[in-house]
Amino acid sequence: MNKPSSKNAASADGGFEHIQAFFDTTRGQITIGEIPPIRRAALAAVGKKARVALVCGETESVADLLQRLNVALGKAAAEDIVIDEVLPEIKRRR
């Protein structure tokens, strides 16, 4: 599979500079999908340490979730914090 050129990727990525920086500076991973009992979520982690965990709203698009993930990764990196919407939501549902 051919990768897009940097020029094409920059225009197609929607400005995901913090997601790019996360990949460039860590050996981390980003997962989008189910984190039971949460049907739709996004998780950015390095090893077993979550940096950002977001719950996708019922009407939120994947593009909107990725944009929120990008902003949250920027904040987490700048402030050296963990942003976790998932654990409070799991506790709320118990």
Question: What is the role of each PLM region?
Answer:
Residues 40-84:
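Amphipathic alpha-helical packing elements
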Residues 2-13, 79-94:
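Short, charged, intrinsically disordered terminal tails
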Residues 1, 26, 30, 73-76, ...:
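Short, flexible helical or helix-coil boundary motifs
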Residues 7-40:
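N-terminal acidic leader/helix
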Residues 33-35, 55-58, 86, 93:
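Compositionally biased, intrinsically disordered low-complexity segments
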